[in-house]
Swiss-Prot record:
Location (main, coarse): mitochondrion
InterPro entries, alphabetized: Smac/DIABLO-like_sf, Smac_DIABLO
Function field: Promotes apoptosis by activating caspases in the cytochrome c/Apaf-1/caspase-9 pathway. Acts by opposing the inhibitory activity of inhibitor of apoptosis proteins (IAP). Inhibits the activity of BIRC6/BRUCE by inhibiting its binding to caspases.
Transit peptide: 1-21
Site feature Cleavage, where: 55-56
Chain location of the short sequence motif IAP-binding per the record: 56-60
Name the record gives this protein: Diablo IAP-binding mitochondrial protein
Result for mutant: residue 81 to D: Monomeric. Impairs interaction with BIRC6. Impairs ability to inhibit BIRC6 caspase ubiquitination
Amino acid sequence: MAALKSWLSRSVTSFFRYRQCLCVPVVANFKKRCFSELIRPWHKTVTIGFGVTLCAVPIAQKSEPHSLSSEALMRRAVSLVTDSTSTFLSQTTYALIEAITEYTKAVYTLTSLYRQYTSLLGKMNSEEEDEVWQVIIGARAEMTSKHQEYLKLETTWMTAVGLSEMAAEAAYQTGADQASITARNHIQLVKLQVEEVHQLSRKAETKLAEAQIEELRQKTQEEGEERAESEQEAYLRED
């Protein structure tokens, strides 16, 4: 009987040990799988959150006391001003040069018409002369329009020059020497360019004045000859 109890006890103990050996790996695997399922999204969350955190945190910059001083900020600001005024001056200079060039062309066109008209004096009838004069009047109106346009642009250009000169002076006063020198050199350059086209326009105006004087002289001479012929004919008729 004692032997039977001992055998049963050993059998029960072995059975439970066997079940424990079977269940422990299963439970362990289950717990491990569940832990893995739980930890996987947490890893993603931590990774994403960490990345966002890195993006959100500003990178500290080295302090530059010299670049943040009032004098440096003023020099930087005045450099921007000189750049802006120089750009404005360049654009107005280009527009003015183009306008003066167009005016000069119109002057030369009118000069050519006057010379042609002068060469045809005494060779045209009244109708042909009227037609030529209509062309001359149209060319003169075109020249006047171009002249007014360039005078208007010249006023704007002079304003741009004044702004650039003030910006250059401000740059000099604040210690932005390079910006001041650059602005003043630019002003001198555009003034030289405008003066060159002005000389061409003045030369054209001189040519026009000469053509008009010649036309007037020829016309006066022709009228004098016609008057002399008329007087001569009248004198002969009286005889």
